[in-house]
C-alpha cells in the first residue's frame, strides 16, 4: 500500500493519515472523491485502493460509528458504473481503471464479513462487458478481465453461481468460436477457464506453463 499511498498528492495523503487516526476531523466526502478521482487515472493505484479505503471505513466505523466515507464511495462507484459505456468509448484506460477499482472495493470492504451486496451485480455487469466479442479483441480488456477473475471470481461465484456460469459460457464460446483472437488472448482465456474448472486454483505445473508463455 505504501506505493499507492505516495501516488496521491500531499493534501490527500495528509487527509488519509488523519482519517485513519481521527476520522471526525476530516471531510470524508472530499477524501472519498479524491481517492476515486485518482483511481480513474492510475491503474497501479486503483489495484490497491480498496485496502486504503478499507482502512478508512474501519476507522470511521470504530471511532465515530458512522459510514460517511463508505456511503459516498458507493455513490461515486454507482455514478461511474452508470457511465461505464460512455467511459469505455472515451478512454480505454479509464474504463479498465473503473473495473479494477470496483473489484478492489468489492474484494476489501465487507459488511458482516460478506461482500457488499449492492456491488455484486455491478461487478458482474462490468465483467460481462469485458467478455463481449468486441472486448475480447482488445488484449487490455482481456487482461483486466482475467486479473479481476483471479482476484474476486471465487467470492463472486459464492454470491451468485448462475451468473458466473453464464459468464464462463460467454468466455468458452469466445475461445472456441471467435477466430480472430490474438494468441495472447487465447492463452489468457484458456488459463482462466482452467483456473475456474480447477476450483479457482492452478496446479504448479499449469502455473509454470501459462506464466512462462506470458513472459515469452
UniProtKB/Swiss-Prot annotation:
GO terms for molecular function: RNA binding; translation activator activity. It comes from the Eukaryota. This is MIF4G domain-containing protein A. Belongs to the MIF4GD family. Its main location: cytoplasm. One of its GO terms (cellular component) is nucleus. The keyword Cytoplasm applies. It comes from Danio rerio. Transmembrane segments: none annotated. InterPro entries: ARM-type_fold (IPR016024), MIF4G-like_typ-3 (IPR003890), mRNA_TranslReg/HistoneTransl (IPR051367). Keywords: Cytoplasm, Nucleus, Translation regulation. Interacts with eif4g1, eif4g2 and slbp; probably tethered by SLBP to the 3'-end of mRNAs ending with the histone stem-loop, it also interacts with eif4g1 which is bound to their 5'-end. It holds the Pfam family MIF4G. It is found in: Cytoplasm; Nucleus. Functions in replication-dependent translation of histone mRNAs which differ from other eukaryotic mRNAs in that they do not end with a poly-A tail but a stem-loop. May participate in circularizing those mRNAs specifically enhancing their translation.
Amino acid at each position: 500500500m505504501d506505493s499507492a499511498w505516495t501516488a496521491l498528492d500531499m493534501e490527500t495523503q495528509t487527509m488519509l493519515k488523519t482519517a485513519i487516526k481521527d476520522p471526525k476531523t476530516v471531510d470524508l466526502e472530499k477524501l472519498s472523491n479524491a481517492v476515486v478521482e485518482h483511481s480513474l487515472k492510475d491503474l497501479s493505484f486503483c489495484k490497491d485502493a480498496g485496502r486504503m479505503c478499507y482502512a478508512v471505513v474501519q476507522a470511521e466505523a470504530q471511532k465515530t460509528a458512522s459510514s460517511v466515507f463508505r456511503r459516498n464511495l458507493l455513490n461515486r462507484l454507482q455514478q461511474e458504473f452508470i457511465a461505464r459505456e460512455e467511459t469505455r468509448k472515451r478512454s480505454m484506460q479509464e474504463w479498465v481503471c473503473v473495473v479494477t477499482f470496483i473489484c478492489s472495493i468489492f474484494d476489501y470492504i465487507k459488511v458482516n464479513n460478506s461482500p457488499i451486496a449492492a456491488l455484486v451485480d455491478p461487478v458482474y455487469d462490468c465483467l460481462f462487458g469485458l467478455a463481449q466479442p468486441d472486448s475480447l479483441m482488445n488484449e487490455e480488456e482481456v487482461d483486466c478481465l482475467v486479473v479481476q477473475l483471479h482476484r474476486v471470481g471465487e467470492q463472486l461465484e459464492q454470491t451468485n453461481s448462475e451468473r458466473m456460469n453464464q459468464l464462463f459460457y460467454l468466455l468458452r464460446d469466445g475461445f472456441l468460436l471467435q477466430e480472430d483472437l490474438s494468441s495472447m488472448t487465447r492463452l489468457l482465456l484458456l488459463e482462466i477457464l482452467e483456473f475456474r474448472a480447477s476450483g479457482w486454483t492452478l496446479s504448479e505445473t499449469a502455473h509454470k506453463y501459462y506464466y512462462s508463455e506470458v513472459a515469452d
